[in-house]
């Protein structure tokens, strides 16, 4: 891969992670109220469902991440990251327009099934980085995390 292509790939990964983490950040302040409205309960009851939603996402991601990793080895990092972003978009649409709590669970499970974008992005960074630039390039993922977790909750707070 040429130097320009590697730089473009690193930029793609940074933007992808920024979008991904900003999306996570947006739902943080919104989800408790959304759950409470869907279950017609208070915030205490909503927190129980929030825990189960988090578990549903985490367990499906835990189970499917090795499969996603194998697929990224076979078909390339970029297509897997793009599919993962599409699935996250679908998850966020389901979160926004869920008529019932079940749809929230469906959305989080879909996101968990394809939620290996961070590990795939890390593998992509390792693939395109020279040993001298690897730490700097991994730092870009950290910067995307930090920026996403600043921007996302602000947007979520304004929308929620």
Write out the residue ranges for each language-model feature.
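Hydrophobic core of transmembrane alpha-helices in multi-pass small-molecule transporters
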Residues: 18, 91, 102-116
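Conserved MFS/SLC helix-loop-helix module at the cytosolic interface between two early adjacent transmembrane helices
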Residues: 62-99
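Extracellular/periplasmic helix-loop-helix junction of adjacent transmembrane segments
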Residues: 34-62
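Interfacial helix-cap and linker-helix signal at transmembrane-aqueous boundaries
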Residues: 36, 71-72, 158-160
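Cytoplasmic helix-loop-helix junction between adjacent transmembrane helices
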Residues: 107-146
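Residue-level signature of mid-helix packing/kink "hotspots" within the transmembrane helices
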Residues: 58-66, 116, 149-150
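Pair of pore-lining "gating" transmembrane helices in MFS-fold secondary transporters
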Residues: 6-37
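Small-residue (Gly/Pro/Ala) motifs that create kinks and tight helix-helix packing interfaces
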Residues: 32, 148-160
